[in-house]
Amino acid sequence: ILRCLVGSEMCIRDSNADNSSQAESMVDESGIDESLTDSSVTHDDADDLSDAVFIGDSRTVGLQNNCDKPKATFLCSVGMHIDTVMTDQNITLSNGNAGTVIDALGERQYGRVYINLGTNELGWPYIDTFKDYYTQLITKIQEIQPDAVIYAESILPVTASRSLQGDAINNTNVATFNQAISEVAQQTGINYLDCTSAVAGADGTLPEEASSDGIHLMSEYCDKWLNYIIDNT
């Protein structure tokens, strides 16, 4: 089941079944590619992801919209933050009521849990605070999903032009926060999944053609991202 809040509307779709307000608005108001469904990248059909759940912000919403994996579960929302992911009631539960990501995770057991959070937090001044909230989330997931393999994904890079705009959404901050995520993964005993190479060019940045706003991925690059996840987990 896809359960997500896109924009201001709660939604549930059958799929089997930021602390800087400036940074947040720049990520969330930029739009998600939902129209480019054709892709030159072949979908990896060997894994239907029926045992997988994806937790994340608008980039994960974009992944769901373009990945053609109807049996995967997506618990995602535009503007999802690490400090409120466990308390915001922005997920539609199986009974139709609004609930948290944690509530939704309690409805069934998964084999794999993928977390992609941090883009909206790139403006946070205190990296230790980010790490504390990330650790709390992982600890709670481990409690609710004791048999699941948990993957903390890296924050994907942004384009070079987006990185040079002079705000918090830049690749220097991406690298800093990814180091923090890697450290949290090691400390909590989960897996750190560096997806950068799946979408980055030779210079380590997101290619300009990969995104209409420098942040959110076009369909082809969503396929590259998902194929990397499938091939490496």
Feature names for model-found ranges:
Residues 134-138, 178:
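Generic structural signal for well-ordered alpha-helices
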Residues 105, 141-143, 185:
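N-terminal cationic-hydrophobic initiation segments that often serve targeting/anchoring roles
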Residues 158-233:
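Catalytic His-Asp segment of secreted/periplasmic serine-dependent ester chemistry enzymes
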Residues 1-14:
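Single conserved hydrophobic/aromatic residue that forms the stacking wall/gate
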